[in-house]
């Protein structure tokens, strides 16, 4: 059976069909319901909200009092010789009450949903590409350091430390080369007087040792009065 839907408006439609086999009953069963929850819920008669009986001599019917901008699920059944009941189904969409519907412009809700999903996916892709571009720009502008001939210079030549500038380890070695002097401590007066005498004796011993090495003059010890 070939079912055709024509003259669809926001509250009605005309359904016509051409039977391929004769109907054994006296009438056709025209069943339809709004398809709000599911596209297909079975061919059982109690699933349909509306049912009309049309004599088998009539091959078209006008449906009225339909909801605007609603998808309808329609089936036509008739008892035949081969099967107890044969169901032939189709779907149609009523028009909207807006002025665009009067001019013949109809937008499928499923198409609108796909368009909305495509727009959201494009926005997400654009944001992700922008974040990746910003990260790549930051990586490109990072300073790249290179060490050449004892000096550290930036790859683009903006910052440079010449060779004459001593490094940190060299400065520590220079500081280690300086002699260390012991700071005077606060001692008693007797120890302060003994220090010049000890220095004088040390000087005398150095003079004697120097004279022995030369060998030209006899060693003469200096005499200090007590």
Swiss-Prot record:
Q: Matching InterPro entries, A to Z?
A: FN3_dom (IPR003961), FN3_sf (IPR036116), Ig-like_fold (IPR013783)
Is Transmembrane helix tagged as a keyword? yes
- What is this entry's stated membrane topology? Single-pass membrane protein
Can you say where in the cell this protein is located? Membrane
- Its principal location? membrane
* Regions crossing the membrane: 113-133
What keywords appear on the UniProt entry? Answer: Membrane, Transmembrane, Transmembrane helix
Q: Name one GO cellular component term.
A: membrane
Does Transcription count among this protein's keywords?
no
Q: Which Gene3D superfamilies match?
A: Immunoglobulins (2.60.40.10)
Domain named Fibronectin type-III: residues: 1-101
Against PANTHER family, the record matches this protein to: FIBRONECTIN TYPE III DOMAIN-CONTAINING PROTEIN 9
Name used for this protein in its record = Fibronectin type III domain-containing protein 9
Query: Organism source for this protein?
Result: Mus musculus (Mouse)
The gene it comes from is Fndc9
